[in-house]
UniProtKB/Swiss-Prot annotation:
Keywords: Cytoplasm, Hydrolase, Manganese, Metal-binding, Polyamine biosynthesis, Spermidine biosynthesis. NCBIfam families: agmatinase. GO terms for cellular component: cytoplasm. Its EC number is 3.5.3.24, 3.5.3.11. Optimum temperature is 90 degrees Celsius. It is found in: Cytoplasm. This is N(1)-aminopropylagmatine ureohydrolase. The record marks 144 as: Important for catalytic activity. Its cofactor is Mn(2+). Mn(2+) 2 binds at residues 133, 135, 213, 215. Coiled coil: none annotated. Disruption phenotype: Cells lacking this gene show to a decreased growth rate at 85 degrees Celsius and a severe growth defect at 93 degrees Celsius. This mutant accumulates N1-aminopropylagmatine and agmatine at 85 degrees Celsius. Disulfide bonds: none annotated.
Length: 288
């Protein structure tokens, strides 16, 4: 199956299937156009895939080898340099085409700027958006661009999608006021717990799009990300939430975004790769 806006790149090393036969389909979005602090998100998809080469495909605590699952990797989106809206349009069109060919598949974006999650949500049309992020991303505009990475949750809210945001430790009063007006619940990293997650997500309508901005994790784990923040969550806290979510809710799509860096062995990419394997494993073992 060919796509207008994708190109071949490094792929997972274990056997892959054609997109039409896959349950999970990877798509890289190497976009870095509105990064406001540390550049390098354009290398994210490749760094995550490289990091998977260091991991065993067998997940011990699941007794599951994800190399035996029907996974496809359709490469990376050919981005429009400096234009988050046009690049997100390419993400949207690619996923719309993909869903026509295989409506039961779960697309997984690897990125890449968080701005590109908008294109995925527009294509997959979830009822709810659950995001782990250090930032609220509810600005109306940032650096004169309404499609900046700092605005993605606001643009998604304007689509009528219900939202819940976890791991926050940075935001503006404007964003907090907007969240209050739109009844968007969020949980500060200091107050995060599994019970707090379940309490807010349990009532959300399905299907759910799950987004992980890698900066939600503690900075010691993820030093290479576009807008790093101290004081984040632990790896197993997020995995526990994912396990519950995929068992209780239908998943429309999933992403791991804002992975930056420039070299093999970067701890940020290694964290993202491990999270990718656990997320796929959880969806296979516990998901519907």
């Amino acid at each position: 199956m060919e796509f207008l806006y994708t190109y071949e790149t490094l792929k997972l090393e274990f056997p892959l299937v054609e997109p039409e036969k896959a349950r999970f389909i990877l798509l890289g979005v190497p976009f870095d156009g509105t990064t406001s602090y540390k550049a390098g998100a354009r290398f994210g998809p490749t760094l995550i895939r490289q990091a998977t080469l260091n991991l065993e495909s067998y997940i011990l605590d699941y007794d599951l080898d994800i190399a035996e699952l029907p996974i496809a990797d359709i490469g990376d989106i050919a981005v429009v340099a400096g234009d988050p809206r046009k690049t997100a349009d390419r993400v949207r069109e690619t996923l719309e085409e993909l869903k026509k060919a295989n409506p039961k598949a779960i697309p997984i974006l690897l990125g890449g700027e968080h701005s590109q999650t908008l294109g995925a949500v527009e294509a997959l049309k979830p009822a709810s958006y659950v995001v782990f992020d250090a930032h609220l991303d509810l600005r109306n505009s940032y650096e004169d661009n309404p499609y900046n990475h700092a605005c993605v949750a606001r643009r998604i809210s304007e689509l009528g999608v219900k939202e819940a945001i976890f791991g926050i430790r940075s935001g503006t009063k404007e964003e907090v006021d907007f969240a209050r007006e739109r009844d968007i619940p969020w949980v500060h990293a200091r107050d995060y717990s599994f019970d707090a997650f379940v309490d807010l997500v349990e009532a959300l309508p399905e299907p759910v799009y799950l987004s992980i901005d890698i900066d939600v994790f503690d900075l010691s784990m993820v030093p290479s990300t576009g807008t790093p923040e101290a004081g984040g969550l632990r790896f197993w806290e997020v995995v526990e939430a994912i396990e519950w979510l995929v068992e209780k809710k239908e998943i429309a799509g999933f992403d791991i975004m804002e992975v930056a860096g420039e070299k093999l062995g970067d701890p940020t990419a290694l964290t993202a790769a491990k999270l990718l394997f656990y997320s796929i494993g959880a969806m296979a073992k516990f998901g519907r």
